[in-house]
Amino acid sequence: MREATVERATAETWVWLRLGLDGPTGGKVDTGLPFLDHMLLQLQRHGRFLLEVEARGDLEVDVHHLVEDVGIALGMALKEALGDGVGLERYAEAFAPMDETLVLCVLDLSGRPHLEFRPEAWPVVGEAGGVNHYHLREFLRGLVNHGRLTLHLRLLSGREAHHVVEASFKALARALHKATRRTGEGVPSTKGVL
């Protein structure tokens, strides 16, 4: 079973995270930030992953450090759980609607970190539970850099912050589920490695 557990501690945060790509799903999520917990549960449910997270951070300063470091820990666990990439689907895309909002996520488990996401171009109003689409960028940046994947996230319609962030997590979850499936033999690259 492809699974990884990571622990990350800094002067600002502490994160313990367990990710399982196959087998049982679910798991307890408690970051001390209820909206982030809600988003991680979307990732767990719609990605059909085992995802357990326990985290604490300097929320009295800002949510930025905690959101970013949970993304970093998730990226580290994803990279470890994927191993050498043998048999991976590798590429995937997913749309996620939520009322007026529509988000597209396209990713490649390439071993090359790149994030294509411009929240300043998103006409989003407000934030949800202390989290906004700029915090989403920091989460994704941590995931991409430490998971070593290429990720494109596009807002096709929507303005309400809660819907935009939640649809983004759902699209990411669905794309990650597809890309992490084992559907072939060998490494899906002409280079022979990811």
From Swiss-Prot:
Pathway assignment: Amino-acid biosynthesis; L-histidine biosynthesis; L-histidine from 5-phospho-alpha-D-ribose 1-diphosphate: step 6/9
Swiss-Prot/TrEMBL catalytic activity: D-erythro-1-(imidazol-4-yl)glycerol 3-phosphate = 3-(imidazol-4-yl)-2-oxopropyl phosphate + H2O
Keywords of this entry: Amino-acid biosynthesis, Cytoplasm, Histidine biosynthesis, Lyase
UniProt cross-references to CDD domains, sorted A to Z: IGPD
Protein biosynthesis keyword on record: no
EC category: lyase
Source organism superkingdom: Bacteria
Entry EC no(s): 4.2.1.19
Pfam families named among the record's database cross-references: IGPD (PF00475)
Disulfide cysteine pairs (residue numbers): none
PROSITE patterns xrefs: IGP_DEHYDRATASE_1, IGP_DEHYDRATASE_2
InterPro entries referenced in this protein's UniProt entry, alphabetically: IGPD_sf, ImidazoleglycerolP_deHydtase, ImidazoleglycerP_deHydtase_CS, Ribosomal_Su5_D2-typ_SF
Subcellular location: Cytoplasm
Gene Ontology molecular functions: imidazoleglycerol-phosphate dehydratase activity
A single BP term in Gene Ontology: L-histidine biosynthetic process
Family the entry assigns: Belongs to the imidazoleglycerol-phosphate dehydratase family.
NCBIfam families, per database record: PRK00951.2-4
Name of the featured protein: Imidazoleglycerol-phosphate dehydratase
Species the sequence originates in: Thermus thermophilus (strain ATCC 27634 / DSM 579 / HB8)
